[in-house]
């Protein structure tokens, strides 16, 4: 069986999860500091991909753009489901 016939496996590593979590905290705090509703703004960004929903304050816009939106959503879903298990 050649390497092309094998299913690829992607591991969303622990460091990636921590980075996404830290980024979301920074973005959330920056949005609050600017007087915006952080949840609405983050959802707007995740749905549209438009970075204008995120302020430049504290480099939040550049930080969130370092992550793919699907990675952020994956981390949010994982955190939500993990919280429900406890």
Curated annotation (Swiss-Prot):
Protein name in UniProt: UPF0297 protein LSL_1110
Xref: HAMAP family: UPF0297
A Pfam match: IreB
PANTHER family: UPF0297 PROTEIN YRZL (PTHR40067:SF1)
Signal peptide annotation: none
Superkingdom per UniProt: Bacteria
Family designation: Belongs to the UPF0297 family.
InterPro entries in the record: IreB
């Amino acid at each position: 069986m050649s390497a092309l016939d094998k299913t690829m496996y992607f591991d969303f590593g622990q460091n990636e999860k921590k980075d996404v979590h830290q980024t979301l905290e920074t973005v959330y705090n920056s949005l609050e500091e600017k007087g915006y509703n952080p949840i609405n703004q983050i959802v707007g960004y995740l749905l549209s991909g438009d970075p204008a929903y995120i302020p430049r304050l504290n480099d939040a816009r550049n930080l969130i753009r370092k992550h793919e939106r699907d990675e952020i959503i994956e981390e949010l879903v994982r955190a939500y489901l993990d919280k429900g298990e406890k």
